[in-house]
Design a protein with these regions (language model features):
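N-terminal capping/small domains of soluble enzymes
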Residues: 1-75, 263
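Catalytic cores of alpha/beta
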Residues: 1-10, 89-94, 153-167, 217-220, ...
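Glycine-rich phosphate-binding active-site loops on the catalytic face of alpha/beta enzymes
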Residues: 15-23, 107, 112-114, 172-179, ...
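Structural preference for beta-strand elements that scaffold enzyme active sites
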Residues: 15-17, 72-80, 105-109, 144-148, ...
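C-terminal helical cap(s) of enzyme catalytic domains, especially alpha/beta-barrels
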Residues: 25-42, 182-198, 240, 246, ...
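Alpha-helix-loop-beta-strand connector modules within alpha/beta enzyme cores
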Residues: 44, 53-72, 125-147, 193-224, ...
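Metal-dependent enolase-superfamily TIM-barrel catalytic cores that perform enediolate-based chemistry
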Residues: 91-141, 146-151, 164
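Glycine/Thr-rich beta-alpha phosphate-binding loop at enzyme active sites
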Residues: 112-125, 158-218, 222, 258-265
C-alpha cells in the first residue's frame, strides 16, 4: 500500500520494505485471516495471510513510485517462492527491472521463514540449497541481500544461516518474522480465524529477538536487523547496544505510528 508507506516515511521511518512478492498472483488464505489478540497479557496480532500478492509482473510497474523514492531512503523488495527456481525467477525479473531505474537504494529481502517450497518445508530447512540460491543471486546483482528468518528457528539453524551469509558479500540477517501459535491458544475459533494457527506479532516477541541478536553478535560480524516485538525507544536502544545494526517495526506502525518520531527524537538526543 503506497499510501501507507508514504505516510510512515513522513513520520520518520528510515526505510521501507514491500510485502513479499511471488511469481504468480495469489489470493492467500481464506478470510478471516487476521485478528487482534492478547498474548501473555500484551496486545498482539495473529495473521494467516498466506502471502497474498498480485504477482511479479503486476508488481514491477509499482516499484519505482516517485512518492516513495523522493525520500531517498532504502526500499526493500521481499521475495518468496514455492520452489528455489521460483525464488530465482522472481529475483531475476526484479533485478532486470531495477537495472533500468535511476533510484539506487533498492535492496532485497529473501523471505525463507514461511513454508515456501514444493515439499512444504521452509527454504531454511535445506541450507545447501539456500547457500546455492544466494550465490546465484550474487552472480547477477551487487545489491544488499537480507535473509529473513523465523523466530521459530533453533539457535543452531540461525547460526548456520549466519555462517553462510558471513561468506557472501553485502548480506545481512533479519530476526525475524512472526512466531507461529495455534489460534485456540489465543482465544480464536474456526468461526473467526480460518486456519489452525498463524503468525503472531507484537511486543511479546521482544525478549526472544533480543536474545537472538546477542547470540549472533557474539559469534559473527554480520549486519543484524532486529524486527520482532520492537515497540519503544528503550527496545531500539537495547537492540542497537546489543549488536543490531538496524531495527524494524510492523505491528507498532498499526498500534502507535507516532512512536516513530518519538524514537527518532530520543535517539538523536542520546
Amino acid at each position: 500500500d503506497v499510501s501507507s508507506l508514504f505516510q510512515w516515511q513522513l513520520v520518520g521511518i528510515g526505510g521501507i520494505t514491500y510485502k513479499t512478492v511471488l511469481k504468480m498472483p495469489s489470493e492467500g488464505n481464506l478470510r478471516p485471516r487476521i485478528q487482534e489478540v492478547r498474548h501473555n497479557g500484551d496486545y498482539a496480532i495473529l495473521n494467516s495471510l498466506g502471502l497474498p500478492t498480485k504477482g511479479v509482473a503486476n508488481f514491477l510497474p509499482l516499484i519505482n513510485n516517485k512518492k516513495l523514492t523522493k525520500f531517498n531512503r532504502p526500499i526493500g523488495v521481499s521475495i518468496g517462492g514455492n520452489s528455489s527456481s521460483e525464488y530465482f525467477s522472481v529475483f531475476k525479473d526484479i533485478e532486470s527491472h531495477l537495472n533500468i531505474l535511476d533510484f539506487s537504494q533498492f535492496f532485497y529481502e529473501i523471505n525463507i521463514s514461511c513454508p515456501n517450497t514444493d515439499d512444504g518445508k521452509c527454504l531454511s530447512d535445506d541450507l545447501e540449497n539456500l547457500k546455492h540460491l544466494i550465490l546465484k543471486f550474487r552472480e547477477i546483482s551487487s545489491r544488499v541481500i537480507i535473509v529473513k528468518v523465523s523466530p521459530d528457528s533453533t539457535d543452531q539453524e540461525v547460526l548456520k544461516i549466519c555462517e553462510i551469509l558471513s561468506n557472501i558479500s553485502k548480506t545481512a540477517i533479519n530476526i525475524g518474522n512472526t512466531k507461529y501459535v495455534k489460534a485456540d491458544s489465543v482465544g480464536l475459533t474456526n468461526k473467526n480465524f480460518s486456519k489452525e494457527g498463524g503468525g503472531l506479532s507484537g511486543s511479546s516477541l521482544y525478549e526472544n529477538t533480543l536474545r537472538i541478536v546477542k547470540l549472533i553478535a557474539s559469534n559473527y560480524n554480520l549486519p543484524i536487523i532486529a524486527t520482532g516485538g520492537v515497540s519503544s525507544y528503550e527496545n531500539v536502544k537495547e537492540l542497537l547496544d546489543s549488536g543490531a545494526l538496524l531495527t524494524g517495526m510492523a505491528t507498532l506502525l498499526v498500534t502507535d505510528p507516532f512512536q516513530i518520531p518519538l524514537i527518532n527524537y530520543s535517539l538523536s538526543n542520546d
